[in-house]
Amino acid sequence: MAKETFAPIQKLSPDDMAVKPNLHLSDSYDGFSWESMYEELDWLPGGGLNKAHEAIDRHANGKNRDKVAMIWEGKNGEREDYTFGDMKRLTNQFANVCQSLGIEKGDRVFIFMDRLPELYVACFGALKAGAVVGPLFSAFGPEPVRDRMKDSGAKVLVTQPDLRRKISGIIPELFDLQHILIANKDGRDPQPIDAQDLSYEEEMDKASNDFTTVETGQYDYSIMHYTS
């Protein structure tokens, strides 16, 4: 077998690059301070730190309320725009859903969905409720979902109809799991949900859009992401 040859590594000055970097590492490193980062954060009224507040509420509470925060484009060409105000309202509703299901600070809420708007609403809403969010790749089979859910002790799973059916065989093994929320976007899946499951849409419709974010701190867990 012929031996592969590779061109030698070339060390270039940023000024000699065809596409110049936005920042110089040495300059950025020398000028960085955590204190300056803290100054850019809004913080919770009680001095805590919460990702959902920093990503959504701080903007929704000010001049950016009607500015588009998220654009979703579906596989079939659909498009939905969500302002910061929309995201605050929806995530407040989901935070209330979490509390109605008994979720307390530090409890695990896992999300097994395609990249639908409901995924982001559930993620940030659960963070507002003080939960630790576990994202699950939608291409996972039953075993990776089971392993992560069992290890984490997740109490709530948010998923969609086809993915719920894919993992139906492992649900009895998840002894800590208390609730499954099924998000059936626009009613696209005609099959009824299982009797023990809850409709994401129905729970959201019942939930208030007024919520005070749970006081979380910068050293509290917020995301539980498994890698292989």
What are these regions (language model features)?
Residues A2-P14, F124, K128-E202:
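Structural core segment of the AMP-binding/adenylate-forming
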Residues M87, V109, A126, L157, ...:
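Conserved S/T- and glycine-rich ATP-binding loop of Class I adenylate-forming
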Residues M1-Y82, D86-Q99, E173-D176, D186-P192, ...:
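N-lobe entry segment of adenylate-forming
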